From Swiss-Prot:
Annotated catalysed reactions: a 1,2-diacyl-sn-glycero-3-phosphoethanolamine + S-adenosyl-L-methionine = a 1,2-diacyl-sn-glycero-3-phospho-N-methylethanolamine + S-adenosyl-L-homocysteine + H(+)
Protein name: Phosphatidylethanolamine N-methyltransferase
Statement: the UniProt record of this protein carries the keyword Heme: no
Gene for this chain: CHO2
Keyword S-adenosyl-L-methionine: yes
Protein species of origin: Saccharomyces cerevisiae (strain ATCC 204508 / S288c)
Bilayer disposition of the protein: Multi-pass membrane protein
Subcellular location: Endoplasmic reticulum membrane
Cytoplasmic side: 77-86, 209-212, 280-291, 384-389, 461-463, 556-869
Length: 869
């Protein structure tokens, strides 16, 4: 993921046009003629500021706007309220269509073919034409044909309009046709936009309830807030983009100016068309009339159609799609996964009411869609018999349990690559594990949201008489907003980001950089902010049902916890703790009061950190008072042990149980045998004496009697004893001899008697055929070897040599019958101890214990996990 190149491609005029003076350079689109655009004014000043010159069209537009109010009064007095409302509703629909369809078509043809500009050039509308026919033009002022008279009139009218509008120093013929055409185009835009606005406002005014009780409530307060916010958006948008982008200037000519994101354009994509219409919904709240709300939704939706089919294509064609190589990193990762893994196919994704990437040969896709179909059909067929309380509990428990399951996978995957390891150790690939995760995550989303839809639908159906139509529509708008957020999020981060690919395939990431394109330009975590608004929309749709409020709180909390405590720490670990300020954050911090609060918090934080550092320095000074050899415990322990041995020798000079070379080696690496020297007074020795090997943690502090079994890890002290226990205990006795005062011998514990577990052990000498302890050796350590993992060949070589010495390898295959102490678990531990990965017992049985396959598989897993680090 990466930051996006700053261009105009995000929106019309989504940048500051530094036009403080007339020194801004501009050029025509096709002929590349450069010029300096004249100073222009906004729509309101042009029409209503008495200090500015007014053209004939501007005066007509102002009169038309004012006349709407007189017409409203007359129609109201003559035909009544309802007729007047519908009269202005029809007018609004006309002007809205003229805006989105009429202006849209004009701009479409101007963008593709420069129709208006070419028309002006063809008919010499803005050129100096002599009274006789110009040899280089098809235009003639002396012709009596209707067409030529018409264009002659248009020529004179347009030139008169511009001269009456612009200052005296404006030279009409010194500028290219593009700028003059744009100035005339602005007049018609003023007419359509102002009429669109005024007729809508009059319609809304006529729909406001007459009762003060219906007006003064929380809806009106929220509506006023939205209206004020809308006004700020429009004013700030014009401050940023100026007239050039406000009137679609780049459809006619291009300005050469620095592009800077600022103000409201940091908050939302296409703010003039998105949050710039919140006033519509504020007025709808004040009216509390669902008809007004539907009209507002129609107006807003048609504006988005204008954006999609007119502005965005022009922007992409003129400025590019606004993406660079870094911004497409996630998309390239998806392509790379498909390229390197031929059996990989894009995952099924649920977006709103549709499914993307359905694969007819993938069973899980049928299972997911079948689950939705079964739940929906079951609900429709049994709607009358479904208990809403039981359904609520089902939705709540399903959401909570499935979220815990998903969160656990992500947390353990982030900490130790647990999910990937689980599949690798069972013989599957890294990408296969990712595919299974994709199914799990998508199924989790589909299941929980399907249950939420069913619960909300039944809640509305059972209580429909109390449902407010406006609340129902507002709820659907919030659902649509969440659906849009999900689509924009996926568009920005692709499938790889949508499915938390950096948790599972971080080795595919080539650039450690978070994306700042699309919706992530405005919000750092859009899924945490807008990803639950649809769930809160169900609260509105159900008239604030308690069960839906509880579910909305659950959705919000689980979403917040997942982002805050699992996703954010992992992102910091993968991409670094770079502080990324969202567009909304930049705008808020740009406000002076909030900036002052932020500065105060930063100063307090610095004071606290400084005091903690000073206190830490003072506390560290006390450590210098300790002796220098305080931490050197090793020599002290050796001295204590020698003293204890000295005391034991004086008490019984012929009692001895020592490990050979114990002064040199206290850690025995398998398969190295451990040889034990023992000595007992002849009067205490019994032919049935035996020596057992135990974990120190098992025997604990009981020094007189062993209360745990040896598990077969024992040896006789004499070859003539324990004849019915096989040869193993005889072969371990390598030496025994007796004198007049004592008996001494030597016992060797090899791989047939030793433990194959890392740990601290001790030998215990037992009297006769009992568990009474006579002697205990010094504790020592046994550890598994660390095999050479430089190459898979060296790893295989060391592994086969070790298994051969342990007597569990036959024909290149692992056969645990050769040593009962070295089983499948021991082999797994050996591999894990050497290479850091674990293979499952099921996988090793599946490959028949083949040492070659096992060693190479373990080495491949190691390489995969290393690439994820």
């Amino acid at each position: 993921m990466s930051s996006c190149k700053t261009t105009l491609s995000e929106m019309v005029g989504s940048v500051t046009k530094d036009r403080g003076t007339i020194n801004v350079e501009a050029r025509t689109r096709s002929s590349n003629v450069t010029f300096k655009p004249p100073v222009t004014h906004d729509m309101v000043r042009s029409l209503f500021d008495p200090t500015l010159k007014k053209s004939l069209l501007e005066k007509c537009i102002a009169l038309a706007i004012i006349s709407n109010f007189f017409i409203c009064y007359w129609v109201f007095q003559r035909f009544g309220l309802q007729f007047t409302k519908y009269f202005f509703l029809v007018q609004y629909l006309f002007w809205r269509i003229a805006y989105n369809l009429g202006i849209g078509l004009v701009l479409h043809y101007q963008s593709h073919y420069e129709t208006l500009t070419n028309c002006a050039k063809t008919h010499a509308i803005f050129s100096k034409i002599p009274q006789n026919k110009d040899a280089n033009s098809n235009f003639s002022t002396n012709s009596n044909s209707f067409s030529e008279k018409f264009w002659n009139f248009i020529r004179k009218f347009c030139q008169y309009e511009i001269r009456s509008k612009m200052p005296k120093e404006y030279d009409l013929f010194a500028y290219p046709e593009e700028i003059n055409v744009w100035l005339i185009f602005r007049q018609f835009v003023d007419l359509i936009l102002m009429q669109d606005f005024v007729t809508y406002i009059i319609y809304v005014y006529l729909s406001i309830p007459y009762s003060w009780v219906q007006i003064f409530n929380w809806r009106s307060l929220l509506g006023v807030i939205l209206i004020l916010f809308n006004i700020w958006v429009k004013l700030d948008a014009h401050r940023v983009v100026k007239d050039y982008a406000w009137y679609w200037g780049d459809f006619f000519f291009l300005e050469e100016s620095e592009l800077i994101f600022d103000g409201v354009f940091n908050i939302s994509p296409h703010p003039m068309y998105s949050i710039g219409y919140l006033g519509y919904y504020g007025l709808s709240l004040i009216c509390n009339d669902y008809k007004v709300l539907l009209v507002s939704v129609f107006g807003h939706y048609s504006q988005f159609l204008f954006l999609k089919y007119v502005e965005n294509p022009h922007i992409e064609r003129t400025y590019g799609d606004g993406t660079d190589s870094d911004s497409q990193m996630n998309s390239r990762i998806d392509d790379l996964i498909s390229k390197e893994n031929y059996d990989y196919s894009r995952p099924l994704i649920n977006m709103g009411l549709s499914f993307n990437n359905f694969n007819k040969l993938r069973f899980t896709d049928y299972f997911t869609i079948g689950t939705v179909a079964a739940l929906m059909l079951g609900t429709i067929m049994n709607a009358r018999f479904i208990n809403l309380n039981y359904l609520f509990i089902t939705v709540f428990v399903t959401k909570l349990v499935s979220w815990l399951f998903i969160s656990t996978i992500l947390y353990k995957q982030s900490q130790s690559k647990w999910f990937t390891r689980l599949f690798l150790e069972n013989g599957y690939t890294q990408v296969y594990s990712y595919e299974q995760w994709q199914f799990i995550y998508n199924y989790y989303l589909v299941l929980t949201y399907t249950l939420m839809i069913i619960h909300t639908g039944l809640q509305i159906w059972s209580n429909f008489s109390n449902i407010n139509n406006s609340q129902l529509i507002f709820g659907l708008i919030l659902v649509a907003l969440q659906t849009w957020c999900d689509k924009e999020t996926r568009l920005a981060i692709s499938d790889f980001g949508w499915f938390y690919g950096d948790f599972f395939l971080s080795n595919y990431i080539s650039t450690r950089k978070l994306t700042s394109q699309g919706i992530y330009r405005y919000l750092n975590h859009p899924e945490a902010v807008l990803g639950v608004v649809g769930v809160w929309g169900t609260v509105l749709m159900t008239n604030f049902a308690v069960t839906n409020i509880i579910l909305a709180v659950l959705w919000t909390l689980t979403n917040f916890i997942l982002v805050k405590f699992i996703e954010t720490p992992h992102v910091n670990k993968i991409y670094g703790k770079t502080k990324r300020v969202s567009g909304v954050g930049k705008t808020l911090l740009g406000l002076k009061p909030l900036r002052q609060v932020s500065d105060i918090v930063n100063r307090i934080e610095n004071i606290i950190i400084k005091s903690l550092v000073d206190e830490s320095k003072n506390s560290n000074g006390g450590a210098e008072l300790l002796p220098k050899n305080y931490q050197d415990n090793k020599e002290w322990n050796i001295l204590i042990q020698e003293a204890m041995d000295s005391v034991a020798t004086r008490l019984s000079p012929y009692c001895e149980l020592k490990i050979e070379n114990e002064q040199v080696e206290t850690n025995f690496v398998l398969p190295t045998p451990v040889t034990l020297n023992w000595k007992m007074p002849i009067e205490l020795y019994n032919g049935d004496d035996w020596i057992g090997l135990y974990k120190v943690i098992d025997t604990r502090a009981d020094r007189e009697k062993t209360r745990v079994g040896s598990g077969g890890h024992w040896s006789a002290t004499s070859k003539d004893s324990y004849m019915n226990h096989g040869l193993r205990h005889k072969e371990s006795v390598t030496e025994i001899k007796a004198t007049e005062k004592y008996v001494q011998g030597k016992v060797t514990f090899d791989t047939s008697l030793l433990y194959f577990e890392n740990g601290i052990y001790e030998f215990r000498y037992h009297s006769g055929n009992s568990h009474k302890v006579l002697l205990i050796s010094t504790p020592f350590e046994i550890s598994l070897p660390v095999l050479n993992t430089t190459t898979p060949e060296l790893f295989e070589k060391d592994l086969t040599e070790f298994l051969t010495k342990v007597n569990v390898l036959k024909d290149g295959k692992f056969r645990p019958l050769g040593n009962k102490f070295f089983g499948m678990d021991s082999l797994k531990q050996l591999i894990k101890n050497s290479i850091g990965v674990e293979l499952s017992s099921e996988y090793m049985r599946r490959v028949n214990g083949d040492a070659h396959v096992i060693s190479h598989r373990a080495w491949d897993i190691k390489q995969t996990l290393d690439s994820l680090a």
